[in-house]
């Protein structure tokens, strides 16, 4: 069944005209040599190959992809221009724009709601902190139909700061499910100077008008997303976006991108975010391109330390690896509800034994842990999820086991927040007990603990 999904049909006027011209010519030439059967066969093949696609490309497309890849595979991609801020009057003067190839772009960050749990039900991640790509398309149609948008998510399933044995243990506990320890999401608005010429000219001439139009559109889209329950903020810097989506690049091969010490491969997969974030990788980037009036397309970039192998259900974008970095994908997809923030740390399971995750990486908080077992579980799972753990001097040996630090203030440092392992002024409080978790957003959310036997040795080290 997966094999048949690689094939499709697409009719375009240009290919139809060529087929209508070549088929009679082939038949006429072959009739002249009394080879009518050959003419009919060639005509049938021309008709078939003018509409048949293999992984989104016709035969002519694959030939073009091969020559394009041979021309560019040893050259590095063009570097984006320096960002410019202050292209229009308030409220859009804090929106950065810059050139990326032939497009002027602006970025909107989607801010996750704090303490939004993720429950894994039969392999699917259930969370209410999502953005629907159909909503993004409707907003583009209503406010800026000549722009296109990329919904970009970047993150990782497990961290890299903990020892390899602890990371392997946490991966075993988490299983092959879509529960990334870290994930951030942006909407990248892209303006083509040719398509937006009329809209941009209403504001000013040249590049200035284009920048003003893009900034005003970004501000309007962010406001409308907020009205629909999605916390969206225009970015005045590309730093966070670049850091999260940066890929090491040395050269492009036919099926991957070779970096300094990593490999990145671009894929398509029809299963949506549940399938995309279940694939094992050191770093994951998903990009869904939305255009008004057209089917969306998606690309998944998986970065690994070893030579990549195609995950089950994925299709590698052969010859189009660099193009996929910019969201250029020949295969169409459908609209999805895309999770915005991290799934977070595994804190327990429901009464029906569905795993429950809670993010701690977007707001400062203090946590009250009921006993040594809860303390051990939360600390080692946070370390495996990529946090930097700081413990008191009395836990020096335990801190060494998880690559932690020793300091006066016990805490867990996330990329954008801190979780204090004790009372702390000025922040909210989370209470974790064997039968519930209490957060500033939830009042005693019922859970049950998950107690893998392999974690017991860490508790023994803590109690020594």
From Swiss-Prot:
The protein's name: ESX-1 secretion system protein EccE1
The organism of origin for this protein: Mycolicibacterium smegmatis (strain ATCC 700084 / mc(2)155) (Mycobacterium smegmatis)
Role description: Part of the ESX-1 / type VII specialized secretion system (T7SS), which exports several proteins including EsxA and EsxB. Plays a role in DNA conjugation, in at least a donor strain.
Cellular location(s): Cell inner membrane
GO cellular component terms given for this protein: plasma membrane
Domain of life according to the entry: Bacteria
Miscellaneous remark of the record: DNA conjugation in M.smegmatis is unidirectional with distinct donor and recipient strains; mc(2)155 is a donor strain while MKD8 is a recipient strain. Mutations in a donor strain that alter DNA transfer do not always alter DNA transfer in a recipient strain.
Phenotype caused by lack of the gene: Increases efficiency of DNA conjugation when disrupted in donor strain. Loss of secretion of EsxA and EsxB, but not their expression.
Protein's gene: eccE1
InterPro entries per UniProt: EccE_dom, T7SS_EccE
Similarity field: Belongs to the EccE family.
Topology of the protein relative to the lipid bilayer: Multi-pass membrane protein
Main location (coarse class): membrane
Lineage of producing organism: Bacteria, Bacillati, Actinomycetota, Actinomycetes, Mycobacteriales
Subunit note: Part of the ESX-1 / type VII secretion system (T7SS), which is composed of cytosolic and membrane components. The ESX-1 membrane complex is composed of EccB1, EccCa1, EccCb1, EccD1 and EccE1.
TM spans (from-to): 11-31, 34-54
The entry's keywords: Cell inner membrane, Cell membrane, Membrane, Transmembrane, Transmembrane helix, Transport
Disulfide cysteine pairs (residue numbers): none
